Amino acid sequence: MKRIVFIFSLMLIISCESPVNNGVSQENQAKFEQQIESFRTFTDGFNKEDLELTMSVIADDIQWSPPVYNGGETIGYDGFVEALEGYFETFEDIQFIEGEGPNLGPALNADANTAFWSGSLYSSATPTDDPSGLRVYGVWKWKHSESGAEGGNKWYGLINFNEEGKIYGFSDYMDYHGMQVQIENYLKSSQN
């Protein structure tokens, strides 16, 4: 009889265990996925060299921190458009490859898309589960229109979204000078 009471008590305790909460609400997950789609619209516009499509996900009050160091100054809407037009004029076949590179996360499977991250469990600022700040990793591939040189840049972006789901804060990091080096190396190799 003691065994039956013990087994019954043990089953009762185990069945009352709280479900594990991974800290991600369905609302925040949906918001995160929508922001990924907005970023994909942005990169699709780049690929098609369609300024209207690219800018369709950009807020009028965008503050952009370009990959070239400029003393920490942010650039507004008109400067952002001007930079995009410069890319479209200078390059063709522009495409973004999400998360290209090794998957270094110990808990992730080899096929996981590690391009997009949001929220912060550990932070020097206040930890948050709010997905309004998106971190994106990948590679931009391109072909230089004038020389025909093909190249690519590893890229990291910090993107903030407003309540309408548009990008209002954008900092991107890449070896901007490396683009010129790749073009120059192509020109040198084609002269030999």
Protein language model annotation of sequence segments:
Residues 17-192:
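C-terminal and inter-domain tail/linker signature
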Residues 12-15:
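C-terminal motif of bacterial Sec signal peptides marking the signal peptidase cleavage site
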Residues 1-4:
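Positively charged n-region of N-terminal signal peptides that target proteins for export
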